């Protein structure tokens, strides 16, 4: 019988898939420290019921810094001592994996079946890579491979007991010798290579070394949502992934999914663990840094005061070098300072820079012997009072030492983490960044950069000495993260719940330097949520409920709450601080024709640079009320070229003669209080013989302009009355 040639390639596959008598697989690694990388390795193996024997824990590492130089011979020495018991174990397969930068994504059976499917004739198999490390001059001596990578990598290899014993015992090795060079020289010896029956997994059918090929290796999901690594260059799906050299950040990305961590159908597989709650409330440190002009610090401090954590269990560290925030800090400390366990405060002009302050805070925290330290910047606004409690519980439950709550600028994709990092050390967008930010993928994620708010447990806090000065060419937060990456400390971002947001402060410094008395007033575009909370009247949203009827003080004169008392007070202070009130005459150079028919003592919004903000405000908050009351009239966006604050004083201009406004409709907002700030005042609508006191601070009168509502401003008899006037849609 003749066998058709095209069927021959199928025979090994059929044989391999019917193998039932697989050898035992023993997995071993060498690790002198219990690092985050080792924990990840063990967790990924455990997910597939693989037990890894860890050798060398607690032993002093003498093998050099293998990230940047040759070394690692100590691993061979430790393995050589251990391998004795497998000298004659021809029915046992030994696998070695590096400890700190490897992730498993398959069980023992799958690994062994893949080995026998592709390498059944071999006794030793090493992973392959595109670089001839550590001695490039050896490249010509390597055997040519038909397809795939041709250079040996010693981070992942497997073989039968006797061959593993022999290769580890061939030569004596010093701790500082290079382990990869050791195996390379054996592989390049053709006699030894054949004797040991060695081969390389050149197409990454089992072992994937990432360095130099990260663009080829992507994340895919099976139909059931199970994650797998896919090598697009060779159309293979490697089972064990090694982040050798500078590819560790990419391994961290893949490691967020592989090892049965995240499933596209089921979500995070390691989340939702039973939270390790304890009645014991540990002493923690709370560190706040204000090192640039940031708006709404007052609100940030209020949220800090509302944190659901006993203040007597908090060591408080505050650093503020911004003059505009000094009073905010003083007010906060006066109200809450004595409640804290202890505190250190730097508030005002200081020679201590932001970088030095952060390093000092770390040491101050350690000296207080805290269990956790939470470092936050002034632009982190937390609406979730349990943020610290949650992070502490996650740190304990998930065994993560550095974790940040995900917060971002509202309505934008800018957040406090990077999903990837470019070759120059700056931001790069990861494939999953958008999904994490939008909440389409939820969990806790190992990322290369976190900032704005970070929790350290005690162990990591001890390791962070001078981390913010690790690289002074970088910003302090980038320096800390680089220190963490270079030293194997994983940085996690948690997006399992909504914690708050980042305050936008990019252009705030410019507003401050312009000499504004209350620069937050100009923040309606950048930080609308906080602006609204501070400056919109608390009763405004009630009137926008469908069933609510807006009050009419006179026919078609609607009276409703609009601005907070604080806004009214600050607007008055801004205008008085500006001080260039018109003289009340008909001559007005601010107007196009230079003539004002009904003059007042006033300052226009465009004079103080508030025109754009006020137009947006009216379109956002006034127009919806107009559409609810004057039904059938729509004009979006609203227009106005007459927006101004009027000042009435008995000795200056106490009243205003009857007139029509040059508008489709107008609003007048009372800015101060009758009986407290002035006497008299009010508005009389002549056609209806109806008078409105207009004395509720922050309330707006809205009425038609040109035709029906002839009105006059009644005399202010004592004090000073201020109103805000806008002629809308002239």
From Swiss-Prot:
<feature type="binding site">
    <location>
        <position position="101"/>
    </location>
    <ligand>
        <name>Mn(2+)</name>
    </ligand>
</feature>
<feature type="binding site">
    <location>
        <position position="721"/>
    </location>
    <ligand>
        <name>2-oxoglutarate</name>
    </ligand>
</feature>
<feature type="region of interest" description="Important for dimerization">
    <location>
        <begin position="664"/>
        <end position="707"/>
    </location>
</feature>
<dbReference type="GO" id="GO:0005789">
    <property type="term" value="C:endoplasmic reticulum membrane"/>
</dbReference>
<dbReference type="GO" id="GO:0062023">
    <property type="term" value="C:collagen-containing extracellular matrix"/>
</dbReference>
<dbReference type="InterPro" id="IPR029044">
    <property type="entry name" value="Nucleotide-diphossugar_trans"/>
</dbReference>
<feature type="binding site">
    <location>
        <position position="659"/>
    </location>
    <ligand>
        <name>Fe cation</name>
    </ligand>
</feature>
<dbReference type="GO" id="GO:0031418">
    <property type="term" value="F:L-ascorbic acid binding"/>
</dbReference>
<keyword id="KW-0847">Vitamin C</keyword>
<feature type="binding site">
    <location>
        <position position="661"/>
    </location>
    <ligand>
        <name>Fe cation</name>
    </ligand>
</feature>
<dbReference type="GO" id="GO:0005506">
    <property type="term" value="F:iron ion binding"/>
</dbReference>
<feature type="region of interest" description="Required for glycosyltransferase activity">
    <location>
        <begin position="20"/>
        <end position="280"/>
    </location>
</feature>
<keyword id="KW-1015">Disulfide bond</keyword>
<comment type="subunit">
    <text>Homodimer.</text>
</comment>
<keyword id="KW-0464">Manganese</keyword>
<dbReference type="InterPro" id="IPR005123">
    <property type="entry name" value="Oxoglu/Fe-dep_dioxygenase_dom"/>
</dbReference>
<dbReference type="GO" id="GO:0008475">
    <property type="term" value="F:procollagen-lysine 5-dioxygenase activity"/>
</dbReference>
<feature type="binding site">
    <location>
        <begin position="98"/>
        <end position="100"/>
    </location>
    <ligand>
        <name>UDP</name>
    </ligand>
</feature>
<dbReference type="Pfam" id="PF25238">
    <property type="entry name" value="OGFOD2-like"/>
</dbReference>
<protein>
    <recommendedName>
        <fullName>Multifunctional procollagen lysine hydroxylase and glycosyltransferase</fullName>
        <ecNumber>1.14.11.4</ecNumber>
        <ecNumber>2.4.1.50</ecNumber>
        <ecNumber>2.4.1.66</ecNumber>
    </recommendedName>
</protein>
<dbReference type="Pfam" id="PF25342">
    <property type="entry name" value="GT_PLOD"/>
</dbReference>
<dbReference type="GO" id="GO:0005794">
    <property type="term" value="C:Golgi apparatus"/>
</dbReference>
<keyword id="KW-0325">Glycoprotein</keyword>
<feature type="binding site">
    <location>
        <position position="711"/>
    </location>
    <ligand>
        <name>Fe cation</name>
    </ligand>
</feature>
<keyword id="KW-0511">Multifunctional enzyme</keyword>
<keyword id="KW-0328">Glycosyltransferase</keyword>
<dbReference type="InterPro" id="IPR001006">
    <property type="entry name" value="Procol_lys_dOase"/>
</dbReference>
<dbReference type="Pfam" id="PF03171">
    <property type="entry name" value="2OG-FeII_Oxy"/>
</dbReference>
<dbReference type="InterPro" id="IPR050757">
    <property type="entry name" value="Collagen_mod_GT25"/>
</dbReference>
<dbReference type="GO" id="GO:0030199">
    <property type="term" value="P:collagen fibril organization"/>
</dbReference>
<dbReference type="GO" id="GO:0006486">
    <property type="term" value="P:protein glycosylation"/>
</dbReference>
<dbReference type="GO" id="GO:0005791">
    <property type="term" value="C:rough endoplasmic reticulum"/>
</dbReference>
<dbReference type="GO" id="GO:0050211">
    <property type="term" value="F:procollagen galactosyltransferase activity"/>
</dbReference>
<dbReference type="InterPro" id="IPR044861">
    <property type="entry name" value="IPNS-like_FE2OG_OXY"/>
</dbReference>
<dbReference type="GO" id="GO:0003980">
    <property type="term" value="F:UDP-glucose:glycoprotein glucosyltransferase activity"/>
</dbReference>
<dbReference type="GO" id="GO:0005788">
    <property type="term" value="C:endoplasmic reticulum lumen"/>
</dbReference>
<keyword id="KW-0560">Oxidoreductase</keyword>
<feature type="disulfide bond">
    <location>
        <begin position="268"/>
        <end position="271"/>
    </location>
</feature>
<feature type="signal peptide">
    <location>
        <begin position="1"/>
        <end position="16"/>
    </location>
</feature>
<keyword id="KW-0223">Dioxygenase</keyword>
<dbReference type="GO" id="GO:0032964">
    <property type="term" value="P:collagen biosynthetic process"/>
</dbReference>
<feature type="binding site">
    <location>
        <position position="648"/>
    </location>
    <ligand>
        <name>2-oxoglutarate</name>
    </ligand>
</feature>
